[in-house]
């Protein structure tokens, strides 16, 4: 970690931290609320399926729109207008200044997330809603990809000194706290899908052995 003087940013925030958290939290809540409501009209069989569907909808939209905005708006940190999407990234860069400098590592990770993982996450939500045969395999694959991206994110920072935060608070709240969500949740979903796939394979093997007899 470092003091604020080592963070190479010269932008001006147009929203307070509290206001940004309030608006961002409201946006995320609405996405989850709408996703939960829609999931009740789908073939998602259990409450856990509905929770997972909400995750895929949420993470998919974040990848496509929020992270996509960062990737495809190179001058966002020069934007001095009250642009909510730009302000979100200005705020997050307090925890990881690599975003403000568009460091190659984070730009690469975010590019893959917005272009590849975003659409695949939304497809995973659709597959779960429609109970598609590729449902668990897709969820497992995307979760592993998210874990891989998260590992690259943390490891690249560690190898470069891990000193990109403006204060210990932003280091733990933003860099560690927020980013860890994409370690914990994908890991849990990957484990769940692995068990589901194994159970299906076991039943199929048992069925095949019964036929042979």
Curated annotation (Swiss-Prot):
EC number assigned by the record: 5.3.3.-
Domain of life per record: Eukaryota
Record bears the keyword Secreted: no
Gene Ontology biological process terms, A to Z: sterol biosynthetic process
InterPro entries: EBP (IPR007905), EXPERA (IPR033118)
Catalytic function, reaction form: 7,8-epoxymelianol = isomeliandiol
Pathway given in the UniProt record: Secondary metabolite biosynthesis; terpenoid biosynthesis
Amino-acid biosynthesis found in the keyword field: no
Membrane topology: Multi-pass membrane protein
One Pfam family per UniProt: EBP
Entry's transmembrane regions: 18-38, 52-72, 109-129, 137-157, 171-191
Alphabetic keyword roster: Isomerase, Lipid biosynthesis, Lipid metabolism, Membrane, Steroid biosynthesis, Steroid metabolism, Sterol biosynthesis, Sterol metabolism, Transmembrane, Transmembrane helix
Record-annotated EXPERA domain positions: 48-190
Tissue specificity: Mainly expressed in petioles.
GO molecular function list: C-8 sterol isomerase activity; cholestenol delta-isomerase activity; steroid Delta-isomerase activity
Gene Ontology cellular component list: endoplasmic reticulum; membrane
Subcellular location: Membrane
General function of this protein: Isomerase involved in the biosynthesis of limonoids triterpene natural products such as azadirachtin, an antifeedant widely used as bioinsecticide, and possessing many medicinal applications including anti-tumoral, anti-malarial, anti-rheumatic, antibacterial, anti-inflammatory, anti-pyretic and diuretic effects. Catalyzes the conversion of 7,8-epoxymelianol to isomeliandiol via skeletal rearrangements.
Protein name (database record): Isomeliandiol synthase MOI2
């Amino acid at each position: 970690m470092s003091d604020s003087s080592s963070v190479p940013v010269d932008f001006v925030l147009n929203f307070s931290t509290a206001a940004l958290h309030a608006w961002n939290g409201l946006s995320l809540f609405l996405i989850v609320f709408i996703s939960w409501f829609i999931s009740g009209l789908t073939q998602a069989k259990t409450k856990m399926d509905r929770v997972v569907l909400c995750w895929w909808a949420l993470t998919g939209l974040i990848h496509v729109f929020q992270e996509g905005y960062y990737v495809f708006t190179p001058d966002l940190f020069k934007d001095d207008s009250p642009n909510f999407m730009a302000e979100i990234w200005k705020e997050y860069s307090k925890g990881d200044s690599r975003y403000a400098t568009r460091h190659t590592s984070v730009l690469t990770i975010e590019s893959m997330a917005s272009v590849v993982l975003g659409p695949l996450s939304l497809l995973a939500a659709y597959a779960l809603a429609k109970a598609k045969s590729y449902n668990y395999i897709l969820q497992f694959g995307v979760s592993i990809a998210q874990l891989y991206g998260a590992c690259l994110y943390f490891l690249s920072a560690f190898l470069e000194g891990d000193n990109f935060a403006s204060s210990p608070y932003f280091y733990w709240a933003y860099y560690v706290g927020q980013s860890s969500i994409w370690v914990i949740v994908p890991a849990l979903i990957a484990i769940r899908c692995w068990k589901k796939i194994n159970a299906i394979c076991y039943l199929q093997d048992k069925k095949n052995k019964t036929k042979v007899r």
